[in-house]
Amino acid sequence: MTIKEELGQPQSHSIELDEVSKEAASTRAALTSNLSGRFDQYPTKKGDFAIDGYLLDYSSPKQGCWVDGITVYGDIYIGKQNWGTYTRPVFAYLQYVETISIPQNVTTTLSYQLTKGHTRSFETSVNAKYSVGANIDIVNVGSEISTGFTRSESWSTTQSFTDTTEMKGPGTFVIYQVVLVYAHNATSAGRQNANAFAYSKTQAVGSRVDLYYLSAITQRKRVIVPSSNAVTPLDWDTVQRNVLMENYNPGSNSGHFSFDWSAYNDPHRRY
């Protein structure tokens, strides 16, 4: 049964981070604090063309970028039931796949493993039963984003598959795959599921407590670059800390991104 939200803009209340998240975040702070400013300097891109053009530069790949897009509203299953949830894309980044060496001056076929669906790092960071229906993909359609997979594959559990590419040696090459990050506001889910995610925020709105968190899925897009052009990849902890914890305030629905609450009353943005 879906929990129906109480209409109205979020009001000013204190932001709560569950105790488990506080402890985990504090131990990682030293490792990620130097990236906080960098995240604020990443550009914002909208749609596949702009995102790909920025991230997938063979001569100079980029770590990540903010993503603009629409907000949609529908059910997401967390813990023991469905929750009415606002969802929008907020970030994209390159995930490290593999380093491969070609020792001779020959053209060879490289074989490597990519993934589809939610990322492994997201799945292992969730401490509750979690599932999303394929119809949530209207968020990508409306944001001019295509994953390269079917809707069901895109929002399912992680699956590996083999991809191949011809490359000429000699040389060492680094492979990255594109990850899309989404922000969610699961309305009324904060009391029951505050410990469901490694990083989350809760916000009181009237009698309900909303839960804010991030999820991540992969695109069927990769870039292979010489090791001399390699970029230090972001990890899921760093992304969550900097995108959600450092750059979004649920009390004012502001920061580096915001939700469009009007999706609740728009049949074209509900699933």
Swiss-Prot record:
Residues 102-170 are annotated as: Pore-forming domain. Requires N-terminal cleavage to become fully active. The metalloprotease AprA can induce the rapid cleavage of pro-Monalysin into its active form. Can also be processed by trypsin. Disruption phenotype: Reduced cell death is observed upon infection with a mutant deficient in Monalysin production. This mutant is affected in its abilities to induce cell damage in the Drosophila gut. It induces lower level of stress and repair pathway activity than wild-type. Residues 1-33 form a propeptide. It is found in: Secreted; Host cell membrane. The keyword Transport applies. InterPro entries: BB_PF (IPR040927). Signal peptide: none annotated. GO terms for cellular component: extracellular region; host cell plasma membrane; pore complex. Its main location: secreted. It holds the Pfam family BB_PF. GO terms for biological process: hemolysis in another organism; monoatomic ion transport; protein homooligomerization. Induction: Is regulated by both the GacS/GacA two-component system and the Pvf regulator, two signaling systems that control P.entomophila pathogenicity. Keywords: Cytolysis, Hemolysis, Host cell membrane, Host membrane, Ion transport, Membrane, Porin, Secreted, Toxin, Transmembrane, Transmembrane beta strand, Transport, Virulence, Zymogen. One of its GO terms (molecular function) is porin activity. It comes from the Bacteria. Pro-Monalysin forms a stable donut-like 18-mer complex composed of two disk-shaped nonamers held together by N-terminal swapping of the pro-peptides. After proteolytic cleavage, the inactive 18-mer complex probably dissociates into two disk-shaped active nonamers in which the transmembrane segments are unmasked and ready to engage the conformational change leading to the pore formation into the target membrane. Multimerizes into circular-like structures and barrel-like aggregates. Monalysin structure belongs to the Aerolysin-like PFTs fold family but is devoid of obvious receptor-binding domain. Pore-forming toxin that contributes to the virulence of P.entomophila against Drosophila, playing an important role in host intestinal damage and lethality. Displays cytolytic and hemolytic activity. NCBIfam families: MonaBetaBRL_TX. This is Monalysin. It comes from Pseudomonas entomophila (strain L48).
